[in-house]
């Protein structure tokens, strides 16, 4: 009986002292604790207790085979910066620091050590400085969302060198300059472009015309000139928003893809007539207000179903839903 008790105690102690196949590594735990410290030890991360397993019960932490593969810190009272030790979580696949208005500083260069990262969400924060060129070293990245921050400077041309990227989502920042010429040479996927509400300007590179973008949103900038490169009868584009810019082209010359369901060209310097081809589209959203358009609105299709405000403030547009010609 005594032997049985001693053996039971021995194996119990042995089981406790052996590392669990589910527990995180010391390297990952230490990196997480340094990240927590850099974020000001917020109450949001109170479950990150150094005496417990970081793969079990730590808020926002996901693990696979004892390694941290997902980290999500969102919607909390966080005051601090992204620790350079984020790069020590080398198996990370998803990183989400979003809706953190007091998260400041830059994107640390050590993020380039995350070679397996496929999802990066850094949105609705106070991150600032330029979007670094080295972010293009994340070749596995599929989803990139840097929207609603305080980023300044130009769009890095190196973003075109990310072969798996499905969208360039850098809207609602303070970016300046023009669309890089390198965007005419994407090395892999043709990503959706979400560049709205920045301080971008200049003409769109003609080289973009060879691409079939699914969605383009350049609204709320200072772009000028033509925008033919986003259109084409044989393309499969679904959504185009060029509103609140200074685009200047003849609308009747534009060849529209039959796939377009949302088209906003309002508040530009677009002239000419509304082409009859627009009556063939299954539009859910349409706006050409505040331009220099003239002539009768083509009848048929869905154009007459939109509010008069979608056509308002042009030079001499007429016909339903506006006044008769």
From Swiss-Prot:
Listed GO CC annotations: cytoplasm; nucleus; perinuclear region of cytoplasm; plasma membrane
Pfam families for the chain: LRR_1, LRRNT_2
Signal peptide positions on this chain: none
Positions of LRR repeats: 65-88, 89-114, 115-140, 142-162, 163-185, 187-211, 213-233, 234-256, 257-280, 281-305
Mutant phenotype after disruption: Delayed flowering.
Complexes and interactors: Interacts with MADS domain transcription factors during flower development. Component of a complex made of FLOR1, VSP1 and AGAMOUS (AG). Binds directly with AG.
The family this protein is said to belong to: Belongs to the polygalacturonase-inhibiting protein family.
Summary of the function given for this chain in its UniProt record: Promotes flowering transition in long days (LD).
Official protein name in the record: Leucine-rich repeat protein FLOR 1
Annotated gene: FLR1
């Amino acid at each position: 009986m005594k032997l049985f008790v001693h053996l039971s105690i021995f194996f119990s102690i042995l089981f406790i002292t052996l590392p669990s196949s589910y527990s995180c590594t010391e390297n990952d735990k230490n990196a997480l604790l340094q990240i927590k410290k850099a974020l000001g030890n917020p109450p949001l991360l109170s479950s990150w207790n150094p005496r417990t397993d970081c793969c079990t019960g730590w808020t926002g932490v996901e693990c696979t085979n004892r390694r941290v593969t997902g980290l999500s810190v969102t919607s909390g009272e966080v005051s601090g910066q992204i620790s350079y030790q984020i790069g020590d979580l080398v198996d990370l696949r998803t990183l989400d620091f979003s809706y953190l208005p007091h998260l400041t500083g830059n994107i640390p260069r050590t993020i380039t050590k995350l070679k397996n990262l496929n999802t990066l969400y850094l949105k609705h924060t106070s991150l600032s400085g330029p979007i670094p060129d080295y972010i293009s070293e994340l070749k596995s990245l599929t989803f990139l969302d840097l929207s609603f921050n305080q980023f300044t400077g130009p769009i890095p041309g190196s973003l075109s060198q990310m072969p798996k990227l499905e969208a360039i989502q850098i809207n609602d920042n303070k970016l300046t300059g023009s669309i890089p010429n390198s965007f005419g040479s994407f090395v892999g996927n043709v990503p959706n472009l979400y560049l709205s509400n920045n301080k971008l300007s200049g003409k769109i590179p003609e080289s973009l015309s060879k691409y079939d973008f699914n969605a383009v949103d350049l609204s709320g900038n200072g772009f000028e000139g033509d925008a033919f490169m986003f259109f084409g009868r044989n393309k499969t584009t679904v959504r185009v928003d060029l509103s609140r810019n200074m685009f200047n082209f003849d609308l009747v010359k534009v060849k529209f893809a039959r796939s377009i369901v949302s088209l906003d060209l309002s508040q530009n310097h677009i002239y000419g007539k509304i082409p009859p081809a627009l009556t063939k589209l299954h539009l859910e959203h349409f706006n050409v207000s505040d331009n220099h358009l003239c002539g009768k609105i083509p009848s048929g299709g869905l154009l007459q179903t939109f509010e008069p405000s979608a056509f308002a403030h042009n030079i001499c547009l007429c016909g339903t839903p506006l006044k008769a010609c």
